[in-house]
Amino acid sequence: MKSEQGLSKVLSLRLDKKTSVIVFLAFAAAYFCSALVRAITATLSPVLTQDFGLQARDLGLLAGGYFFGFAATQLPLGTWLDRYGPKRVILCFLSLAVLGCVAFSMATSFTSLLAARVLVGMGVSACLMAPLTGYRRWFDASALLRANSWMLMTGSLGMLASTLPVQWLMPLLGWRPMFWILAVMILTTMG
């Protein structure tokens, strides 16, 4: 009897096709942004080096700061996803990413750049696990496999977007406005 109630509850959480597509696109857009902000500092390293007088170790710390923020949230993330659900968790986390992007664009020192990168890392740390948790709850088995693989592809596209497109936009916009644009992109995924 108890297992039937559990199965009934799981089946009642399944989404219809249209809602599934909307949910996937929202999560995929967030994961795209996550991968983009993860890799963008490598593309911007010459400009950041020039503007802040950074050395190779500083660039390494900027990259590491992102991963430190990301890693710091991983243990509690699983509990929060189970307790509050993927939607609520990713929205809270993405708010941190928006703040981090804005702080990065306004940074005046290496320390403020590093703090902003840690905040961004924390903010996007749920961008893969929240969707995978949601898909497991809301999609049937065949849709789950497709959604998971498409999510990983979306992340790869985000990494690609951090290279040539960013290099093309740099002379037009500069790196600070690009982080404002990233903040707006992340806000848009939250909508």
Question: What do the PLM-derived regions correspond to, one by one?
Answer:
Residues A72-T108:
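Conserved MFS/SLC helix-loop-helix module at the cytosolic interface between two early adjacent transmembrane helices
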Residues K2-A30, S34-A35:
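Cytosolic juxtamembrane N-terminal segment immediately preceding the first transmembrane helix
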Residues M151-G191:
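Helix-loop-helix hairpin linking two adjacent transmembrane segments in secondary transporters
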Residues A39, F67-L75, M159-L160:
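Residue-level signature of mid-helix packing/kink "hotspots" within the transmembrane helices
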Residues A116-T154:
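Cytoplasmic helix-loop-helix junction between adjacent transmembrane helices
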Residues G100, T111-L119:
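Paired small-residue
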